[in-house]
Each structure stands twice: as structure tokens, then as C-alpha cells.
């Protein structure tokens, strides 16, 4: 689920410009053979994954307990808008925790731990969450729209570290 949209975009960009194959791990290989059999062979490699989450448990109240996939800091997680990729379509959610007005004075001085966070998708209970296609193992990604920042040259977006290599390869292959 995490990589499927990127794979699809690259297949569109490179249609007719490179041969596409796959390995058993889900890797995508684009080959652009030269007419000259003595031409050097060059490999460009990149990865397209992104950090995210996976639903571990749905509480009776309909909150989603989750595990992190990749490196997440607790300090930046609360209030993060996310997309839950359910079996019946994508759902908007937000990462939450116990609200500040019911925290003890000691709890207010500490960073909320991942284990104490949940995803709220706006349902009343577990049954309703399941009705919308949420399940244990359901993939979850951070929501982020690409934006141009103040200087007009700097871009803000997610998964750049992973996907910039794919953009370079698509450019080299003529996409």
C-alpha cells in the first residue's frame, strides 16, 4: 500500500521508454537496453518506501492503537493528520492521546509515549471502524500536501529522501 502509488506513477512515466520487471520482494526494475551490446551497463538504485504506521488494535471505543514503521519521534506525532488505508478506501484521522485537562501535573511535564497514543478516525466504536474497512494490520501514512515555501524555491513534502532517487532515475530513462 505504501509504495503502490509511486510504482504506478513511475510505470506511467516510463511506459514505452523502459522494460519493466519485478522481483519476489516487490522491487521494480526498469531496463533500458542499448542497441550497442558493448555499451557499458550502469545501475541506478533507489528506494521508494516511506515511514508510516500499522493498526495494531481497534479499541471498543473505535480508537486505533498502532505501531510505528520507521523512525518517529514522539515529540512530533500528536496532532499529526494521517490517512488510514482501509479495505473500503482511505480515511482521514489524527493522532491523539489523553487530553491535557485530565493529565496529572507530573504527566504534563513529560512527552507522551507512543504506546499512549491512538488514531482517532471519528467513529463511535470498534464495530463502526470495521464497517469503514479498518482492520488489524491496516496501513497508515502521514498526510502531507506538497507546498512551495516562502523563498519560492524550497519545497515541503514527505518521503523526499526516498523518492528523489526515483525522480532522478525517471529523468535519466527519459520519463
PLM regions and their residue ranges:
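N-terminal hydrophobic/helix-forming segments and targeting peptides
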Residues: 1-175
Amino acid at each position: 500500500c505504501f509504495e503502490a502509488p509511486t510504482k504506478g506513477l513511475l510505470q506511467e512515466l516510463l511506459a514505452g521508454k523502459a522494460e519493466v520487471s519485478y522481483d519476489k520482494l516487490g522491487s521494480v526494475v526498469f531496463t533500458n537496453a542499448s542497441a550497442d551490446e558493448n555499451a557499458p551497463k550502469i545501475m541506478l538504485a533507489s528506494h521508494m518506501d516511506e515511514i508510516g504506521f500499522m493498526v495494531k488494535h481497534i479499541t471498543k471505543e473505535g480508537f486505533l492503537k498502532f505501531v510505528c514503521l520507521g523512525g518517529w519521534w514522539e515529540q512530533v506525532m500528536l496532532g499529526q493528520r494521517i490517512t488510514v488505508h482501509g479495505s473500503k478506501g482511505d480515511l482521514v484521522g489524527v493522532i491523539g492521546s489523553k487530553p491535557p485537562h485530565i493529565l496529572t501535573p507530573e504527566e504534563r511535564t513529560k512527552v507522551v509515549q507512543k504506546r499512549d497514543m491512538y488514531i482517532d478516525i471519528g467513529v463511535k466504536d470498534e464495530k463502526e471502524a470495521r464497517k469503514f474497512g479498518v482492520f488489524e494490520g491496516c496501513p497508515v501514512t502521514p498526510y502531507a500536501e506538497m507546498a512551495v515555501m516562502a523563498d519560492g524555491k524550497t519545497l515541503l513534502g514527505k518521503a523526499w529522501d526516498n523518492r528523489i532517487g526515483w525522480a532522478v532515475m525517471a529523468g535519466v530513462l527519459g520519463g
